[in-house]
């Protein structure tokens, strides 16, 4: 069988300075990929990052639970007294689909493999809204008009759940350190998990997203999950995946020497120059 070395390296052009030969980190990824395919050891049962305690699953749509496990493992998922199972593919990937559900909860989701069992608790079924944008979307509830009072009342919003993707660094006017630069190259821009709505979780959450979600929960009378991914000053091009950029004649040139490209707004290039001042990869 052929081993797919493309998938893990495609998002990392920084590992190929001459566009052909990988640096040490790239060679390590190649070796780990070969090892996993030969041994079927992909690190055991794991869920995609969006599946955690306190999450919301979309109502009235088929519900998909997915992740990775070791190659050939049996994975069983139990939800609302329904049990479904599948065998992971040769790369350790798995996905299980449950029928569409009406709103409700709280529920538990149990995921079991040959070696591990994961139980997700306090799950609701309702409507999920993706809240993305620049600094206007990132503007925190605690800093809004009457925000302090709203933060204190947030615990009453028991059917609102929050997933705040926290950026590894702000795009402020300072150079990033080596750890931030390494995580950026690894595409580890955000971290986060679902949380209930209370005075701690909501104070730094998007004010726009929170008030929107509060109104939706009241008007529709269903649980609401809000996913915040917002980066101040981010251009629209940064929200488009690499494959789409590469395969569109109108925007493909954005990927060529982008820090000096007229296709990128001058203020974006200027700030990128500051943030990436300590980068060893000049591209």
What are these regions (language model features)?
Residues 1, 7-10, 41-283:
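Cell-envelope and extracellular/periplasmic
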Residues 1-42:
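Catalytic His-Asp segment of secreted/periplasmic serine-dependent ester chemistry enzymes
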């Amino acid at each position: 069988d052929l081993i797919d070395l493309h998938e893990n390296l495609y998002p990392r052009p920084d590992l190929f300075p001459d566009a052909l030969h990988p640096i040490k980190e790239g060679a390590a990824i190649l070796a780990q990929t070969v090892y996993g395919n030969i041994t079927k050891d992909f690190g055991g049962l794991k869920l995609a990052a969006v599946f955690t305690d306190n999450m919301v699953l979309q109502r009235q749509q088929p519900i998909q639970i997915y992740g990775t496990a070791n190659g050939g493992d049996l994975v069983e998922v139990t939800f609302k007294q329904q049990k479904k199972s599948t065998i992971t593919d040769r790369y350790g990937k798995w996905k299980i689909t449950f029928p569409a559900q009406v709103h409700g909860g709280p529920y538990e989701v149990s995921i079991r493999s040959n070696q591990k069992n994961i139980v997700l608790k306090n799950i609701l079924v309702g409507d999920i809204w993706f809240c993305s944008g620049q600094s206007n979307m990132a503007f925190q509830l605690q800093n809004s008009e009457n925000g302090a009072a709203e933060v204190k009342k947030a615990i009453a919003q028991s059917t609102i759940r929050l997933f705040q993707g926290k950026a590894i660094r702000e795009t402020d006017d300072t150079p990033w350190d080596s750890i931030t630069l390494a995580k950026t190259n690894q595409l580890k821009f955000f971290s986060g998990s679902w949380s209930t709505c209370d005075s701690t979780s909501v104070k730094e959450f998007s004010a726009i997203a929170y008030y929107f979600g509060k109104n939706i929960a009241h008007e529709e009378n269903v649980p609401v999950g809000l996913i915040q991914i917002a980066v101040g000053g981010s251009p629209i091009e940064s929200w488009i995946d690499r494959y789409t950029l590469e395969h569109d004649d109108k925007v493909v040139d954005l990927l060529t020497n982008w820090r000096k490209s007229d296709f990128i707004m001058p203020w974006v290039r200027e700030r990128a120059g500051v943030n990436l001042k300590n980068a060893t990869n000049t591209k």
